[in-house]
């Protein structure tokens, strides 16, 4: 995939013809965010987080989306011992903080979040999140920007987060419309400038 070629963590994704109640359609299946996903993407096992949908649904309707937070997805890694628990709790706290800062500044930040920058976890040259945001928008995969659809890997070696591609809806039948309208959608020029400012 394009994102995999750009060295982003991506799950195995494939289309399957299924029949539900006699209606045949093509459905998209993605690999679960587990140890095998990290190994296949040449990452050491560590905490995987995802957007927490449990607090944003009320009476069957989406609400409180700006208050969305995260949760640990690979709980077995947490249970490995004191060191993995300490790493997970520190990373979880940092990611929750980034979600709260973004929630309080949603008008300015829109769908953008960089937990490394918001927590000063990486040096200013770490452009992982700006580049990921740019690539997702270029692919018309904005569905993956929804905060309860996001996934994150915490790299224990450099103490920083990495985005994990998930549910971008790139294969959607309305994707062509998204690509045609992407030019008219606002995009923070600073994100592009920060990510690709050295491409003069």
Please annotate each region the language model reported.
Residues 6-18:
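Short, well-structured beta-strand/strand-turn elements
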Residues 17, 141-153:
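Catalytic-loop signature of eukaryotic-like protein kinases
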Residues 18-19, 23-27:
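Hydrophobic or amphipathic alpha-helical targeting/insertion segments
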Residues 34-136:
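ATP-dependent phospho-/nucleotidyl transfer catalytic cores
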Residues 48-51, 56-60, 150-152, 161-168:
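Active-site substrate-binding loop specific to GH73 endo-beta-N-acetylglucosaminidase modules
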Residues 119, 140-141, 153-200:
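C-terminal catalytic region of ATP-dependent kinase domains
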């Amino acid at each position: 995939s394009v994102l995999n070629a750009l060295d982003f963590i991506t799950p195995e994704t494939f289309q399957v013809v299924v029949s539900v109640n006699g209606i045949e359609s093509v459905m998209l299946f993605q690999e679960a965010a587990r140890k095998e996903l990290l190994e296949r993407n040449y990452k050491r096992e560590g905490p995987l987080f995802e957007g927490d949908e449990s607090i944003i649904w009320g009476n069957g309707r989406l609400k409180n989306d700006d208050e969305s937070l995260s949760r640990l997805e690979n709980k077995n890694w947490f249970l490995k011992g004191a060191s993995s628990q300490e790493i997970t709790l520190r990373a979880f706290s940092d990611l929750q903080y980034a979600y709260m800062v973004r929630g309080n500044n949603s008008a300015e930040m829109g769908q953008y979040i960089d937990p490394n920058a918001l927590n000063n976890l990486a040096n200013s040259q770490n452009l992982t999140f700006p580049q990921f945001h740019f690539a997702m928008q270029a692919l018309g995969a904005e569905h993956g920007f929804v905060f309860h659809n996001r996934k994150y890997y915490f790299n224990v070696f450099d103490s920083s987060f990495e985005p994990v591609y998930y549910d971008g809806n790139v294969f959607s039948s309305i994707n062509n419309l998204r690509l045609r309208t992407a030019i008219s959608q606002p995009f923070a020029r600073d994100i592009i400038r920060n990510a690709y400012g050295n491409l003069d």
